[in-house]
Amino acid sequence: EFSNFIEDPYITADIDREPFTDEVEVAIIGGGFGGLIAGARLSELGFEDIRIIEKGGDFGGTWYWNRYPGAACDTEAYIYLPLLEELDYVPSQKYAHAPEILSHSKNIAEKYGLYENACLQTEVTGMRWDALASRWVIQTNRQDRFKAKFVIMSNGPLHRPKLPGIEGINSFNGHTFHTSRWDYEYTDGDSNGALEGLRDKRVAIIGTGATAVQC
């Protein structure tokens, strides 16, 4: 009954492709900074057959999902953003905002050719070791069943919204959404604000952490 809280509101078009049944040298599960750095460094070492499997519609990890108004990183950009020298990039602010971080993620993937063999909008549903073939067999929700010589687990915990255990949450009739799935169709505006859709609304924010303060 809470499936709407985990749907991806940022996908503009569903990916239509045939299931993969091939073999790759390296499979990386997760397209956030961990997966991107792994893919980049492997590429620098000469690995060419790299496939990143990412549930979201693009690279970025937590910065793909968290696009709420005011979202920013509380660590200095020169420390937080990876591969700055490799991309010859200078952050625009001391504390980068979410759109810039997401853009940097995509630029990393572009530079290292990680889009070419990626499985976006794809979730791993199973993985087992084939001892006879000495390969991992990976299955996904898109009916993929391919093999990999090496697997790097780079999936984080922040892609799934944490709902509060409040009595009556499942029967509330007002409009609700999680900050990691911000509903701009309802609020209008963008990450900079201008939420005209909320002008005449009474809004309750559940939580008092950094996300609540920023948005």
Protein language model features and the residues they cover:
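Feature captures the FAD/FMN-dependent oxidoreductase FAD-binding
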Residues: P91-H159
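Phosphate-coordination loops involved in phosphoryl transfer and adenosine-cofactor binding
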Residues: E23-E25, Q121, D200
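Glycine-rich active-site loop/strand segments that organize a redox cofactor
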Residues: Y64-N107
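Short, flexible hinge/linker loops that cap or flank conserved catalytic cores
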Residues: E18-T21, R145, G197
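Rossmann-like nucleotide/phosphate-binding core characteristic of flavoprotein oxidoreductases
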Residues: E1-E25, L45-D49
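Glycine-rich FAD pyrophosphate-binding loop
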Residues: S43-Y68
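Glycine-rich dinucleotide-binding loop and its adjacent helix/turn
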Residues: F2-I15, L83-P91, H97-I101, N155-C215
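N-terminal Rossmann-like FAD-binding beta1-loop-alpha1 element of flavoenzymes
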Residues: T21-I52, A212-C215
